Design a protein with these regions (language model features):
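Extended, highly charged clamp/arch subdomains and adjacent linkers
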Residues: 1-200, 205-206, 352-360, 644-647
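Core structural elements
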Residues: 2-18, 36-39, 60-74, 83-100, ...
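Flexible, glycine/threonine-enriched loop-and-boundary segments that flank and lead into catalytic domains
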Residues: 3, 8, 102, 198-207, ...
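Short His/Asp/Glu-rich catalytic/ion-coordination signatures at enzyme active sites or charged loops
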Residues: 15-17, 21-22, 45-48, 404-438, ...
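Intrinsically disordered, low-complexity regulatory segments
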Residues: 101-103, 146-149, 160-165, 169-172, ...
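Gly/Pro-rich turn-and-neighbor structural signature
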Residues: 177-194, 444-498
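Conserved catalytic core of nucleotide polymerization and phosphodiester-bond processing enzymes
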Residues: 209-216, 221-230, 237-242, 247-248, ...
Length: 941
């Protein structure tokens, strides 16, 4: 195929910009077009002159190279470069990549009516409010102000009205009243980059504030992952009435109090609020006038105002007929004669709670407050929870100020016994060293004993330090409340001993840092102590880019998954067991069951098939002996496109059954990717510590390995059949082998049965050569099942797929990803991982095509194959036989039905070329392709 005409972009897309001094800055495309024109003219001239064939061929080659450079300069062996030595950007470069036409201009657009500024906290705001600077308000709401000025006849025409708004030196006072009126019913969207999940964009009612900073409610910081150390946020104004209504219904901050990833509260009572509430609810012994009896709470408040008692005085008071909680989870007993022993501070705290949550008669730490918000969401709903959170915020800030709690260097002191403890530890270390030099212990034993000596010494110093600390002092109050990340370990490092440190590989260094920050550290101690911090900084920097790329791939895979039907009618389900949940690091299977739909009835508790497992239902299960529950899952959903409501279950962000049109694939991708930067980059090595599996890959690299289905570095050999283990050693090579023989009682390798029927049966056998240095996990004569690992290591999901099938591979991927997240303290619902794994296992390959139109080895969507087989069977033909295929994220994203979506992901030029060659048709059904052509996306929110 020969091109006789090449496309020329409009001048607006390859501008020529005049510079000072008569020079011009032009687009690289102009240079490439110029080269094509110049060489094309040379070929024309040589043809007219009837030049020799050799010269013509050379000129044609140069013309071909110029055309190649114009279309795709980056993939040439020697790309054409500009004056700075950088390759010139060709037509392909303008379309592909992060700054290409698709990702920069089509899928991501800049918008008008937006602003950006630094954020600061404002304790006076309500949860649904934010503060915008006056200058920003005037600019954002300028069209609305101009309309009001014209309607009220304050300006003769639009030009005069615009001048009134833009006159910032001496603004007309009437503007402020009109601005308040305009802003009263308008919501603005606040966005903090990076926008890792849906809670990074929320709607607020804007109020006008002085200064240049945006003011933010302190409780929404955790949802935005924001703090007030210089963070910036963007403001966007929805213009139409429909956009305002949608923002109020879906994005308002008081309607987004649950995390979509886990269902936990997205608002967080923290820091000063926690400190103030803990101080308010403390019960300090020995206070003045303790034991007084009051008729009701108001009488106790009068006594507080008169100075007869204080906040922490233990008193007896009558309360209404309410449930009494003396401690967290202590039951719902009602006090006798409605009299309780409490403090005035606790009366004030409970006065801020709804009646259904009273009476909390214990000190409120950060963990207690988090559970209180969870209970409030369950019992009272989002609107009441937002009001309660605002009241607790005000109360906490007030009493954090009233408490006068502060922290000074004089609050800590070095325990006198420290030097004696260290001297004793040094003597023990010398004994261990002498024993080692005498050859009586090994290096590993020496290492272990040194660690034990210094661990005991550190604990002894900690005990002395804790005994000397005032239990009611400022420092102890800060630690007990949980207001900060500081625990007693940090106090020990301040005035006791820093202790043992770990090197960047994760191994404990057997030489401790004996100093503390109060006395000061030696140079070498500071260097050792800082090694962990250096590792943390490097991990965070490397994690950010890798985590962002992982999130992008997850989103690409999940884009095609949304709720498309009410019920797919499947009878299949996923079995959840208590043992499996414990292996993932969970205390029970409650969190995994929450929000699911039963696939099989639970006759023990009278639950029918199809029952929605709400919090009330799930909380009843621990009282029974049920250890396994079969539930509907995205993995077993039979909807040919998307997922049905019953297989997905509850939308964790709302607590209700998921709505049709919800983009559950994008929500799943955001839920998995958002905590990605919290995962470590570390690979732990054995280094003297016994470890059966050798090096263990954890954190983000392990998550990437699982989602990309890479072969593990230390892959465990697994049995492909059921049978009996026979361990042998090859005498010639010395290599240890494991033979797995099925139906051992009928095989010739064992004594045959009396009827000699062994010779009539075919014995299946597999032989595995074991790699040296790997720990054997099976014994001679042991009966094992298919999929059992023979040596220590990491299982390969593709081996599981070929040996045990699709369900086993899917369960393994879900459990392994969850194990990584749970190890870092991140809770994530299984259904999000199941949605992504469903897409990874969506395809099959044709093994026997039968009477279908498929090709051998062709990769097809499994639901498409089921439809083809059903049609062929109805016609009396032979169906196709297929086997499942497990794709990594990158491969799965490229297998999308839409070539527009695939081209905007990566390999743009290759995807577009293949689509053109095959004449592919895009039906414009998904999110990205609809955005590209300007249609509405197929989701309800």
């Amino acid at each position: 195929m020969t091109l006789s005409v090449i496309p020329v972009l409009p001048p607006e897309l390859r501008p020529l910009v005049p510079l000072d001094g008569g020079r011009f800055a032009c687009s690289d495309l102009n240079v490439l077009y110029e080269r094509v024109i110049y060489r094309n003219n040379r070929v024309k001239r040589f043809l007219a002159l009837e030049a020799p064939e050799v010269m013509l061929n050379n000129e044609k080659r140069l013309l071909q190279e110029a055309c190649d450079a114009l279309f795709d300069n980056g993939h040439r062996d020697r790309p054409l470069t500009g004056s700075g030595g950088q390759p010139l950007k060709s037509l392909t470069d303008t379309v592909s990549g992060k700054r290409g036409r698709l990702r920069k201009d089509v899928l991501g657009k800049r918008v008008d009516y937006s602003g950006r500024s630094v954020i600061v906290g404002d304790p006076g705001l309500s949860l649904h409010q934010c503060g915008l600077p006056t200058k920003m308000c005037l600019e954002l709401f300028k069209p609305f102000l101009i309309r009001k000025l014209l309607q009220r006849h304050y300006a003769a025409n639009a030009r005069a009205a615009k001048h009134m708004v833009e006159r910032t030196r001496k603004p007309d006072p009437i503007l402020w009243d009109l601005l308040e009126e305009v802003m009263s019913d308008q919501l603005v969207l606040l966005n903090r980059a990076p926008t890792l999940h849906r809670l990074s964009i929320q709607a607020f009612e804007a109020i006008r504030v002085e200064g240049n900073a945006i003011t933010l409610h302190p409780l929404v910081c955790s949802a935005f992952n924001a703090d007030f150390d210089g963070d910036q946020m963007a403001v966007h104004l929805p213009l139409s009435a429909e956009a305002q209504a949608e923002a109020r219904a879906l994005l308002l901050s008081t309607r987004n109090l649950r995390s979509p990833s886990s269902g936990d509260p997205s608002i967080s009572l923290s820091q000063d609020i926690v400190l103030g509430l803990f101080y308010l609810t403390q019960d300090r012994p020995g206070r003045k006038s303790a034991g007084r009896v009051f008729a009701d709470a108001s009488e106790a408040m009068h006594a507080l105002d008169a100075g007869v008692i204080d906040l922490h005085t233990r008193i007896v008071v009558r309360i209404p007929d309410q449930r009494l909680y003396e401690a967290l989870g202590s039951g719902k007993a009602r006090p006798k004669h409605k009299r309780i022993e409490t403090t005035v501070g606790r009366l004030m705290f409970n006065d801020a709670l709804p009646e259904r949550l009273r009476f909390k008669n214990y000190a409120m730490t950060k963990d207690h407050l988090k559970l209180l918000v969870v209970e409030c969401l369950q019992v009272c709903g989002t609107e009441v929870t937002a009001q309660v959170a605002d009241r607790l915020k005000t109360l906490g800030f007030h009493y954090a100020t009233r408490s006068g709690i502060s922290f000074a260097i004089s609050d800590i002191e070095v325990p006198p016994a420290k030097h004696e403890i260290l001297a004793s530890a040094d003597a023990e270390v010398e004994e261990v060293e002498q024993t080692y030099r005498a050859g009586m212990i090994t290096g590993e034993e020496r290492y272990r004993q040194l660690i034990e000596v210094w661990t005991r010494a550190t604990e002894a110093i900690s005990t002395k330090l804790e005994a000397a600390l005032d239990p009611w002092g400022s420092l102890a109050t800060i630690i007990k409340s949980g207001a900060t990340k500081a625990k007693f370990q940090q106090i020990r490092q301040l005035s006791g001993i820093r202790g043992l440190m770990a090197n960047p590989s994760g191994d404990i260094i057997p030489v401790p840092v004996k100093g503390n920050y109060l006395e000061g550290l030696k140079v070498w101690e500071l260097f050792i102590a800082a090694s962990g911090a250096r590792k943390g900084f490097m991990d965070r920097s490397l994690n950010t880019a890798r985590s962002g790329y992982l999130t992008r791939k997850l989103v690409e895979v999940g884009l095609e998954v949304w709720i498309t039907a009410e019920d797919c009618g499947t009878t299949q389900g996923l079995l959840m067991t208590h043992e499996e949940s414990k292996s993932m690091g969970l205390p029970s299977m409650r969190g995994r069951l929450l929000g699911r739909v039963l696939a099989e009835p639970l006759t023990e508790v009278g639950l029918e098939r199809g029952t929605l497992l709400s919090e009330e239902v799930v909380d009843c299960l621990p009282a029974t002996d049920i250890t396994a529950v079969c539930v509907r899952s995205p993995l077993t959903c039979q909807a040919p496109y998307g997922i049905c409501q019953r297989c997905y279950g509850i939308d964790l962000a709302t607590g209700n059954l998921v709505r049709r049109g919800t983009a559950v694939g994008v929500i799943a991708a955001q839920s998995i990717g958002e905590p990605g930067t919290q995962l470590t980059m570390r690979t732990f090595h054995s280094g003297g510590i016994a470890n059966a599996q050798g090096d263990i890959t954890l954190g983000l690299p392990r998550v990437e390995e699982l989602f990309e289905v890479r072969t593990p570095k230390h892959r465990a050999t697994m049995s492909e059949i059921d049978g009996v283990v026979v361990i042998e050693r090859d005498e010639a090579t010395g290599v240890q082998c494991v033979r797995v023989i099925s139906r051992e009682e009928r095989c010739g390798a064992y004594p045959p049965p009396p009827d000699n029927s062994a010779h009539d049966e075919v014995c299946e056998e597999r032989t595995y050569s074991l790699p040296s240095g790997h720990k054997l996990l099976v014994e001679h004569g042991q009966v094992i099942s298919a999929g059992t690992p023979l040596v220590a290591g990491t299982l390969d999901p593709r081996n599981l797929l070929s040996t045990l099938g699709r369900d086993a591979a899917a369960r393994y991927l879900v459990s392994e990803v969850q194990r990584v997240y749970h190890s870092t303290g991140v809770y994530l619902h299984d259904k999000h991982i199941e949605v992504i794994v469903r897409q990874m296992l969506r395809f099959v390959t044709a093994r026997d095509v039968g009477d279908t139109s498929l090709l051998p080895g062709e990769i097809v969507d499994r639901f498409t194959v089921e439809a083809i087989n059903a049609r062929v069977l109805a016609e009396g033909g032979a169906p196709a036989l297929v086997q499942p295929v497990l794709f990594g994220l990158t491969q799965a994203a490229m297998q999308t039905r839409s070539w527009i979506a695939a081209a905007s992901f990566q390999d743009t030029s290759r995807v577009l070329a293949w689509a053109a060659i095959r004449g592919e048709l895009d039906t414009i059904e998904g999110f990205k392709e609809r955005l590209v052509v300007g249609r509405r996306i197929p989701t309800s929110g």
